[in-house]
From Swiss-Prot:
GO terms for molecular function: ADP binding; ATP binding; phosphoglycerate kinase activity. Signal peptide: none annotated. It is found in: Cytoplasm. SUPFAM superfamilies: Phosphoglycerate kinase (SSF53748). One of its GO terms (cellular component) is cytosol. This is Phosphoglycerate kinase. Its EC number is 2.7.2.3. The keyword ATP-binding applies. Monomer. ATP binds at residues 211, 329, 356-359. It comes from Levilactobacillus brevis (strain ATCC 367 / BCRC 12310 / CIP 105137 / JCM 1170 / LMG 11437 / NCIMB 947 / NCTC 947). Belongs to the phosphoglycerate kinase family. Pathway: Carbohydrate degradation; glycolysis; pyruvate from D-glyceraldehyde 3-phosphate: step 2/5. The gene is pgk. One of its GO terms (biological process) is gluconeogenesis.
Amino acid sequence: MAKLTVSDLDLKGKKVLMRVDFNVPIKDGVIGNDNRIVAALPTIKYVIEHGGKAILLSHLGRIKKEEDKPGLSMRPVAERLSNLLNKPVTFVPTTEGKQLEDAIDGLNDGDVLVMENTRYEDVKDGENVKRESGNDPELGKYWASLGDVFVNDAFGTAHRSHASNVGIASNMSQTAAGFLMEKEITFIGGAVDNPEHPFVAILGGAKVSDKIGVIDNLLAKADKILIGGGMTYTFYAAKGMKIGNSLVETDKIDLAKEILDKAGDKLVLPVDSVVAEKFDNDAPHKTVEGDVPDGYMALDIGPKSVAEFKDVLKDAKTVVWNGPMGVFEMSNYAEGTLEIGKFLGTLTNAKTIVGGGDSTAAVQQLGVADKLSHISTGGGASLEYLEGKTLPGIAAISDK
């Protein structure tokens, strides 16, 4: 990889500032899912095993007013990290000042410290000042002064220019990617910049508007783009097909027409749909080919579409999947998503890359996650990367 990584650094005795993505679901101090904490462990362990002092920064949720702060403290995250590492972790309930500086000065080689939620800096004295999320230059400079080197392992925020990623990096002589960031750059960056062919993209989700940039960028690179999910029916409308009460972005129909004209046979739409009388798992539903009848809405791709998609995927060497094929959270309309997820697990000769919450949930539910090459930890970041955009968090990492 052309970027500096944590394994290129001399860490012994160094204060290693680490931007991690510990933005986990938390309610009443209880963590709902610790995947993001677990994902950062290899980099944290590497730093402390090589004699570094790990000083971890992360945001947690959005803070718009003082009352948001208590429920979004990093304390439970530090406790969970301590359990996962099986060693004490120092938690500092502030993001700046003497208490934090003294705690950092007191660290021994191999120690771990978690500072308070970086977004506490977004609200000061009741004012919404956005020092962290607005990349306040003084804040980035201050945080940079607390460490010797900077490791960015938070791909989930790589598409954002914040004080805790870009701000710190711009005040450091060396910024390296952590192992998680390195993996994202290698797999997603590799798929976008230098894929092995045939390269097939599977794009789902509700809105064409969310995926336009990705479709545009991948039309030039992919051999086929398979479309599923709610956005299918904006394309159907663009072809003059009937869509019943299905989801449609009427203001995007002309754009969908342009994409269809440009794509030719590269863009593959579903040929059948599972349709229901209303948006309800228990509503009467059936499978129809082509047009969606009046009084029905399409909520999943049908079995013929699944078979056609599998036929395209079976010879692929690179596959990128982002977005569900239907209303995955309702069992009667989850089949398309689950079938695609299951099939990807059988493609042992291909690089298989999955991103997006529902697609990731599907492969985890099916138990095939470990059979895939890479599951992306970034929602918006992986989408923008697939769009071919320069991500500020990655651009700020030093080149080798």
